[in-house]
């Protein structure tokens, strides 16, 4: 068998790839061994006696399948864990994610007009103070706060209406008493005359 090291080197240079990617037709070894220049190698490539092998695929099918299973909680038991809980998911990262979620929600609610800037500021500081464990807790708190504010407003309006009615009644009574007094005075003056 002829030594084709030179031809392989030249072919790799012409094809701009590594020597392991160069395929030479084993049936045409005698013709390939005569090629001793780049020009001759180009001719062999054109004729299809020398070919660049395709890139090997490194399939991600199995790893995708494993990741899908891990999302469902498989393969994550005690026996599969190497690092501490803090190393696997740092508490600082958990805290940052939670704060970003809560602050994004507060911003969205403020911009859409669901909460005013005062309630936004109060809830922002409460979120910073670790009051809300998750997004749902914050949403429920906002709903409760709004319901409480509406109830307080309704009670205040009712009290104001009650006060206004009582004041109007007092004024009517005072007016009636004044009129009665005037009538008595006029009646007394008539009697005296």
Swiss-Prot record:
Additional detail: There are 2 genes for eL19 in S.pombe.
What is a single molecular function from GO for this protein?
A: structural constituent of ribosome
Task: List, alphabetically, the InterPro entries matched.
Answer: 60S_ribosomal_eL19_sf, Ribosomal_eL19, Ribosomal_eL19_dom, Ribosomal_eL19_dom1, Ribosomal_eL19_euk
> Is NAD set as a keyword in this record?
no
Q: Which gene encodes it?
A: rpl1901
Q: Which UniProt keywords apply?
A: Cytoplasm, Ribonucleoprotein, Ribosomal protein
Tell me the protein's name: Large ribosomal subunit protein eL19A
One Pfam family, short name: Ribosomal_L19e_C
Q: One of this protein's GO BP terms?
A: cytoplasmic translation
- Function as written in the Swiss-Prot or TrEMBL entry: Component of the ribosome, a large ribonucleoprotein complex responsible for the synthesis of proteins in the cell. The small ribosomal subunit (SSU) binds messenger RNAs (mRNAs) and translates the encoded message by selecting cognate aminoacyl-transfer RNA (tRNA) molecules. The large subunit (LSU) contains the ribosomal catalytic site termed the peptidyl transferase center (PTC), which catalyzes the formation of peptide bonds, thereby polymerizing the amino acids delivered by tRNAs into a polypeptide chain.
**Chain intervals for the UniProt region annotation (Disordered):** 156-179
Q: Which family does it belong to?
A: Belongs to the eukaryotic ribosomal protein eL19 family.
The record's Gene3D superfamilies line, in alphabetical order, gives: 1.10.1200.240, 1.10.1650.10
CDD domains in the record: Ribosomal_L19e_E (cd01417)
Cell compartment(s), UniProt: Cytoplasm
Signal sequence, renumbered to the chain:
none
PANTHER family, per the entry: 60S RIBOSOMAL PROTEIN L19 (PTHR10722)
Primary location recorded for the protein, binned into one broad class: cytoplasm
Where along the chain is composition biased (Basic residues)?
A: 164-174
Subunit annotation: Component of the large ribosomal subunit (LSU). Mature yeast ribosomes consist of a small (40S) and a large (60S) subunit. The 40S small subunit contains 1 molecule of ribosomal RNA (18S rRNA) and at least 33 different proteins. The large 60S subunit contains 3 rRNA molecules (25S, 5.8S and 5S rRNA) and at least 46 different proteins. eL19 lies in close proximity to the binding site for eukaryotic initiation factor eIF4G.
One GO CC term on file: cytosol
Annotated source species: Schizosaccharomyces pombe (strain 972 / ATCC 24843) (Fission yeast)
């Amino acid at each position: 068998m002829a030594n084709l090291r030179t031809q392989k080197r030249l072919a790799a240079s012409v094809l701009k790839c590594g020597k392991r990617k160069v395929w030479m037709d084993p049936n045409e070894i005698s013709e390939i061994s005569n090629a001793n220049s780049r020009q001759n190698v180009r001719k062999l490539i054109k004729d299809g006696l020398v070919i660049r092998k395709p890139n090997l695929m490194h399939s991600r099918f199995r790893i995708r399948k494993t990741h899908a299973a891990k999302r469902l909680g498989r393969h994550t038991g005690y026996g599969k864990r190497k690092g501490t809980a803090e190393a696997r998911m740092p508490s600082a990262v958990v805290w940052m994610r939670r704060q970003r979620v809560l602050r994004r929600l507060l911003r969205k609610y403020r911009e859409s007009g669901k909460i005013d800037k005062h309630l936004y500021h109060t809830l922002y500081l409460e979120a910073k103070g670790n009051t809300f464990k998750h997004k749902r807790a914050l949403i429920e708190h906002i709903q409760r706060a709004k319901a409480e504010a509406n109830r307080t407003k309704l009670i205040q309006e009712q009290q104001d209406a009650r006060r206004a009615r009582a004041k109007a009644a007092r004024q009517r009574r005072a007016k009636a008493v004044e009129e009665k007094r005037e009538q008595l005075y006029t009646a007394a003056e008539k009697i005296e005359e």
